[in-house]
């Protein structure tokens, strides 16, 4: 397993954007051109290039020659590399990517105040009870731990919104370990949280417990 990250401390330069646009597919270029905000296009480009760079490094490929497909529920994959599973997430200034030999999910969330009201609608009764039991000063922090863990689980399962958020429960214990109450018939999986930034929560869900130790940071130059 590998986790790669890029922190956007500045916008892409015109030259960097042009080189990345030249490496991605025509469909991705068109998607980037349709974004109203340039930073959204840059996040999309960087996420695409993170995957290309990871695949190229692992398999000795030309990054620009990699083609992507889409599974039934919209999860991207590389048809030529059936043993390479990956997932991308971005929020705020962060773009992260997880790569493994088995299905994997990753989610990063920038924390914002005043968002925990949606917990009762989307979280399981167990999760909502855990959240309510936290001190008010800790509730936003724990809410985003729950949200990122649940999103990583759904992305690992690869079933999109067909898997309701309240159909399973996750719990972050005081020692940092995560317990999961799985939906009926679901394959075993494991979740770990990572420290990316004090303003963000990051979680990875994998089919095995052998997580990597941390995030391997990449610069714009390393993606070109």
Swiss-Prot record:
Q: Which domain of life is it from?
A: Bacteria
Q: Which UniProt keywords apply?
A: Antibiotic biosynthesis, Magnesium, Metal-binding, Transferase
User: Could you give one GO CC term from the UniProt record?
Assistant: cytosol
- What job does this protein perform? May activate the peptidyl carrier protein (PCP) domains of surfactin synthetase SRF1/2/3 and iturin A synthetase, by transferring the 4'-phosphopantetheinyl moiety of coenzyme A (CoA) to a serine residue. Required for the coproduction of the lipopeptide antibiotics, iturin A and surfactin.
Recorded consequence of changing residue 216 to A: In strain: BBK-1
Q: According to the UniProt record, what happens if one changes residue 15 to E? A: In strain: B3
Q: Which cofactor does it need?
A: Mg(2+)
Effect upon mutating residue 195 to E: In strain: A13 and B3
Q: What is its EC number?
A: 2.7.8.-
Which parts of the sequence bind Mg(2+)? 107, 109, 151
Question: NCBIfam families, alphabetically?
Answer: pantethn_trn (TIGR00556)
Listed InterPro entries: 4-PPantetheinyl_Trfase_dom, 4-PPantetheinyl_Trfase_dom_sf, AASDHPPT_N, P-Pant_transferase_sf, Ppantetheine-prot_Trfase_dom
Task: Give the catalytic activity.
Answer: apo-[peptidyl-carrier protein] + CoA = holo-[peptidyl-carrier protein] + adenosine 3',5'-bisphosphate + H(+)
Q: Name one GO molecular function term.
A: holo-[acyl-carrier-protein] synthase activity
The protein, known as: 4'-phosphopantetheinyl transferase
What is any Pfam family matched here? Answer: ACPS
What is the similarity comment for this entry?
Belongs to the P-Pant transferase superfamily. Gsp/Sfp/HetI/AcpT family.
Keyword Transferase listed? The answer is yes
Task: Identify the species of origin.
Answer: Bacillus subtilis
Q: Name one GO biological process term.
A: fatty acid biosynthetic process
UniProt xrefs under Gene3D superfamilies: 4'-phosphopantetheinyl transferase domain (3.90.470.20)
Extract the ranges annotated as region (Peptidyl carrier protein binding): 158-189
SUPFAM superfamilies given in the database record: 4'-phosphopantetheinyl transferase
Show the taxonomic lineage.
Bacteria, Bacillati, Bacillota, Bacilli, Bacillales
